[in-house]
Regions:
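Extracytoplasmic/secreted proteins, especially bacterial periplasmic and envelope-associated proteins
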Residues: 32, 36-43, 52, 90, ...
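Short, well-ordered beta-strand elements
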Residues: 326-327, 335-354
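Short, surface-exposed loop or secondary-structure junction motifs
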Residues: 73, 126-328
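Short, gly/Ser/Thr-rich active-site loops of penicillin-recognizing serine hydrolases
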Residues: 291-300, 351-370
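Bacterial Sec-dependent N-terminal signal peptides
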Residues: 1-28
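Short, conserved catalytic-motif segment at the N-terminal edge
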Residues: 29-86, 108, 156-165, 322
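Short active-site loop at a secondary-structure junction
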Residues: 48-54, 75-137, 166-179, 255-258, ...
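A short acidic/small-residue loop/turn micro-motif
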Residues: 70-74, 332, 355-357
Length: 370
């Protein structure tokens, strides 16, 4: 005869199971209740008037909390869901850095070989100093390039509008630059017999598929067209459909500096793979997290974020319980951010379809880091 388990025991087991599920950790390892996190996030979204959000929390190398919240557009009021696609903006750089290190592991290029030896760059060839630029300099923002030639303030007596130039000699100081990533992406495409329009399939093969990033692309496709949500600036729907830094750029380009399209669950898969050291050699993983350049205390990254150095595609920030590795993204109408603690493999990542991401990041960090 089979004995029945008393109802009270069943209830207790259910409560214990629910309690363990809802008990989360901050990046330092402090306990956090999932219901409290729900309320906190909702409060921040309401106070900042954020339309939509994709958010994930990682504990011990696993996603333990994932939310798709808000609306895809303030006009249509359609709900954000788990298939909604956001712009990663500059968080693209961390993913591209990993892609580059995959190529280094394959001996296609060396971090310290000048890039012109692989592919001369006509855009800057009149300044011989560009021949000093290496992949390491690109990924640590020491190329000397401006962020973007079309947007940065330039000396109009020296450079025409749209002309690429060097602000400083390569390798001498930190100068955040998307232009460097542009050049390196051209090199990676060239070394693989591809173009900037045909590079994304290689990214899928080398990074997205192995790390189980089901929805993550640098170039446009039908899935993005059907699932990408709408950006917002100052509470108004943005008219921009694709992020661009060049007049001739369109969705076919592989934009290494800011073109990744994805959401929090898939980006978490990347962060988990990175923290676990999957896909690249241990020495290159360590190189990625190693400080390549110290930041000046007057740097905006130091003053605003507390970053003291830069690795390969990632910022380094000391905190009371160790070190946080982070990156943000800002395409204006889409913003994003992630922070990870490599020591305990805890972290978080978010995407929002508005210009309030930096403010949200500060608020969520108060709960999950400070």
């Amino acid at each position: 005869m089979v004995k029945k388990i008393p109802t009270i025991i069943v209830l207790l087991l259910s409560l214990l199971s629910y309690s363990s599920y809802s008990q989360l950790q901050t990046l330092s390892g402090k306990k956090l209740n999932s219901e409290d996190l729900d309320k906190y996030i909702k409060k921040q979204m309401d106070s900042l008037a954020m339309p939509g959000l994709s958010f994930a929390l990682i504990n011990n190398g696993k996603v333990v909390y994932h939310r798709s919240l808000g609306v895809t557009s303030e006009e249509t009021k359609l709900k954000v869901n788990d298939q909604s696609i956001f712009e990663a903006a500059s968080m693209s750089k961390t993913v591209f850095a990993y892609f580059v290190l995959r190529m280094v592991d394959k001996k296609l290029l060396d971090l310290d070989t000048p890039l012109y030896r692989y592919l001369p760059y006509a855009d800057i060839e009149k300044d011989e100093r560009y021949k000093l630029i290496t992949a390491r300099m690109v990924l640590s923002h020491t190329t000397g390039f401006p962020n973007w030639r079309y947007f940065d303030k330039r000396d109009e007596n020296l450079y025409k509008y749209g002309e690429l130039y060097l602000k400083v000699t390569p390798g001498t100081e930190f100068a955040y630059s998307g232009e460097g990533y542009r050049y390196l992406s051209l090199v990676i495409a060239h070394l693989n017999g591809l173009s900037i329009q045909t590079l994304d399939p290689l990214f899928q093969k080398e990074v997205a598929v192995p790390l189980h990033m089901k929805h993550a692309w640098f170039s446009g496709n039908n899935y993005i067209s059907n699932h990408k949500i709408t950006g917002h600036v100052n509470g108004m729907v943005s008219k921009k459909s694709w992020p661009t830094s060049f007049p001739e750029q369109d969705s076919t380009w592989f934009d290494a500096a800011g073109g990744l399209h994805t959401e929090a669950l898939d980006f978490s898969a990347f962060l988990i793979g990175l923290m676990k050291g999957k896909g690249i050699s241990k020495s290159l993983v360590n190189e990625m997290f190693k400080e390549q350049v110290a930041l000046d205390k007057k740097s905006p990254h130091y003053l605003v974020n507390g970053d003291t150095g830069w690795g390969l595609g990632i910022a380094i920030r000391p905190v009371s319980f160790g070190t946080i590795y982070e990156h943000g993204g800002n395409n204006g109408d889409f913003q994003s951010g992630f922070k990870i603690n490599r020591a305990n493999q805890n972290g978080y990542v978010f995407f929002t379809n508005c210009d309030k991401g930096a403010a949200f990041n500060n608020k969520i960090a108060e709960l999950l880091i400070n």
